[in-house]
A protein has these predicted regions:
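Glycine-rich, Lys/Arg-enriched anion-binding loops that position phosphate/diphosphate groups
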Residues: 107-200
Length: 288
């Protein structure tokens, strides 16, 4: 039986308190874990090794089931290609489709911001659901569902379809709230949604609403956690070039990510720290 455990970036060791007591363990799309019980590890984030000393352990031990490729568009695609090469694994058709979409969504290789926020296709609808308001139990079920069903079939499940419908119905409300909350610092736009507990992260909607934005910083929270995201608007109308490694910048505050996008997770009671962190992020993004 597979038991998914959702990991959260935080100060210190995020694996502390996570029981590694199963017959086998795998960590995917998350920071490196040097515990010898973690037999499988796949990641594609340049900030995977925190603290940096963990990179030395990875290079020295380099277990044959530890895999790292910061150039991979998505971890899902990286895993599929690695297993195909090393173990001759052939994914079923429905997973090939899921991996193709994972590469596109994770790397944001959409031609326009409008395409990025569309909710027309099953993969786009599932992506919106995964990004907004699903519970840890939903995520665990999603992993199980996707092991034997297509994205279209998962999107129509009774546990998922009503939540996707709610996202669609509330899209106009979210757009109005995001537009009203936008605060500009040069060409960096900030969306502080901390006062609306449970509010959705703007994600690509911010880029769609404000095509002249160069970077976007957003803050959202639930009762238990706070999430800060930082991203470069690859569809920006601005002519300046990105000079900030966003993932490395977020890593300085306990988070991580890629060169163009990153995130930071704090406890739900760290609101003051969250707003101070956003101010520091903006200062870094506007001085370049």
């Amino acid at each position: 039986m597979i038991k998914p455990i959702g990991m959260v970036h935080r100060d210190g060791n995020p694996f502390e308190g996570i029981p590694l007591d199963a017959d086998d363990h795998a960590c995917v799309d998350f920071r490196f874990c040097a515990d010898p019980k973690m037999r499988w590890w796949f990641d594609h984030h340049p900030t995977a090794f925190q603290p940096p000393a963990l990179r030395e352990i990875f290079d020295r031990a380099h277990e044959p089931t530890w895999f790292f490729d910061p150039k991979a568009p998505s971890c899902a695609g990286f895993i599929a290609r690695t297993l195909a090469t090393g173990w001759n694994w052939q994914p079923p058709t429905h997973l090939i489709d899921a991996v193709t979409w994972a590469d596109k969504i994770d790397a944001a290789t959409f031609s326009t911001a409008q395409e990025a926020v569309a909710l027309e296709l099953p993969a786009q609808r599932i992506a919106a659901w995964l990004a907004n308001g699903r519970s840890g139990m939903d995520t665990a079920r999603y992993i199980e569902w996707l092991s034997h069903a297509s994205l279209a079939e998962v999107a129509e499940r009774p546990e998922v379809a009503p939540q996707i419908a709610a996202i669609e119905e509330e899209r106009a409300k979210d757009l109005a709230a995001i537009e009203k909350l936008a605060v500009w610092h040069d060409d960096v736009v900030v969306f502080d949604r901390f006062d609306d507990v449970g509010a959705r992260n703007p994600g690509f909607l911010g880029y769609w609403l404000f095509p002249h934005a160069f970077y976007a910083v957003a803050g959202t929270r639930t009762e238990s956690s706070i999430k800060i995201t930082v991203g470069f608007n690859k569809w920006t109308t601005s002519t300046r070039k990105p000079t900030v490694d966003v993932g490395a910048l977020c890593a300085r505050f306990g988070g991580g990510g890629h060169s163009m996008v990153g995130g930071i997770t704090l406890r739900g009671d760290e609101l003051q720290r969250a707003r101070e962190t956003i101010a520091q992020l903006v200062a870094e993004l506007t001085k370049h």
